[in-house]
Amino acid sequence: MKIKHMPAKKSRLSKAQRDFLDTYFEVNPHPNTQERAYIASQSLVSEEKIRNWFQNRRTRERGDCKIASHRSAFSVNTFEENTSSVHPTSNDLYIRR
């Protein structure tokens, strides 16, 4: 009979750690190796977790930009569709018999 090992419990960052990382991300979203080592020592988080956090945050940032641009394009199209019936075009000014 094989004994299955339970995976290690995933540790979460504290609010203070997230705030520190968010602040650093605003200044530099691409920290180099030395900067990641500094961040890890200041936040008491492993360098690997810091590297992953920045990678995930950049991905999330790109995804948020795509969603925002899609929403703004959608709202402009919706606005144009809704206002076309309110404002007649030049062709609508001619009465066809």
Curated annotation (Swiss-Prot):
<dbReference type="Pfam" id="PF00046">
    <property type="entry name" value="Homeodomain"/>
</dbReference>
<dbReference type="GO" id="GO:0000981">
    <property type="term" value="F:DNA-binding transcription factor activity, RNA polymerase II-specific"/>
</dbReference>
<keyword id="KW-0539">Nucleus</keyword>
<keyword id="KW-0371">Homeobox</keyword>
<dbReference type="GO" id="GO:0005634">
    <property type="term" value="C:nucleus"/>
</dbReference>
<dbReference type="InterPro" id="IPR051306">
    <property type="entry name" value="Homeobox_regulator"/>
</dbReference>
<feature type="DNA-binding region" description="Homeobox">
    <location>
        <begin position="6"/>
        <end position="65"/>
    </location>
</feature>
<dbReference type="GO" id="GO:0000977">
    <property type="term" value="F:RNA polymerase II transcription regulatory region sequence-specific DNA binding"/>
</dbReference>
<dbReference type="InterPro" id="IPR009057">
    <property type="entry name" value="Homeodomain-like_sf"/>
</dbReference>
<keyword id="KW-0238">DNA-binding</keyword>
<dbReference type="InterPro" id="IPR001356">
    <property type="entry name" value="HD"/>
</dbReference>
<dbReference type="InterPro" id="IPR017970">
    <property type="entry name" value="Homeobox_CS"/>
</dbReference>
<protein>
    <recommendedName>
        <fullName>Homeobox protein HD-9</fullName>
    </recommendedName>
</protein>
